[in-house]
Amino acid sequence: TAIRNEFKEKIESELAMGFETRPVQANTEEELEDVFAAKPAMQDVKVLDRLDDNNAGSEKRLIDAIGEGLKQSMQQHPNLILMGQDIAEYGGAFKITEGFVQEFGKERVRNTPLCESAIVGAALGLSLKGFKSMMEMQFADFVTVGFNQIVNNLAKIYYRWGQNADVVIRMPTGGGVGAGPFHSQSNEAWFVHTPGLKVVYPSTPADAKGLLIAAINDPNPVMYFEHKALYRSVSGPVPEHYYEIEIGKARLVQSGDDISIITYGAGVHWAMDYTKNHPDISIYILDLRTLLPLDYTAIKDAVKATGKVLLLHEDTLIGGIGGEIAAWIAEH
């Protein structure tokens, strides 16, 4: 009886305090600002606006540009840990981390079991302890095994508890390489309606390096999609220095007057090939580069440029990013 009375008094006391508390007045702008952690200023990294003769650098394949961005990030951040299946001695399924374990050691380049949920959870745990982490999904298809960790833990931990989820998840994605239905999916749309995540998808080697560096420097969780079919088929100039491409900023590939194509990833190369084969059509091509947050200013400019828009992506038509952008254009 004494214990019950003690708890009853405690409950009644807490209830009285709760009823005396003034109701919370929600402020939408403040709530939205709390979705992402602020990115700290960095003096030793340049933001690359565009390639020109002064900064173009040497020709590299997309896969090599990703590896270079990852290696420079490891050199820049002694607290950066890489994790994934067979990424150490073997160098990963696509050999992006080949030689990394010899240069940076097994403490920073870690093989993991075949358990994506555990890898994402370990990456988040490292972040809570002050580390940065990059985990490699061997194939983007298997992100489903780690889905709960990503959308309910990584994406929400800063908004809910003020803790950073300083994690980048690299996602080898896309079809066209004869890999079958379990190794060829384009699943970026699964994540673009999850507040707290950032989603990037480069199409060129220069953007691949710069966006990866930007993702690692960002204190928020970033889903970094890289198309497998572009790894060794696409080359381009890549600056040698350590630089970022701004997350949330699209790239104008070329101007045009007849129609605008808004696309990203492999779609950029499809659009460029179509343009070469149809020189009689003046085509405006916009490479989104970032899918969350979208660059709505650039999208608006693309619409205004021609008054006609084609949305091009590899992902499933129903529920894809193209439909969302089409709806936004219609609304505005």
Indicate where each model-derived feature is located.
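Thiamine diphosphate
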Residues: T1-A16, L32-F225, A229-L230, ...
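Terminal amphipathic helices with adjacent charged low-complexity linkers/tails
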Residues: N5-D53
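Acidic-histidine catalytic/liganding microenvironments
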Residues: T21, H77, T194, D218, ...
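Flexible, glycine/charged-enriched surface loops at secondary-structure junctions
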Residues: R22-E31, Q85, N164, D280-L288
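Proline-centered turn/helix-capping motifs that create local helix->coil transitions or kinks
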Residues: P23-N27, P219, M223, R232-P237
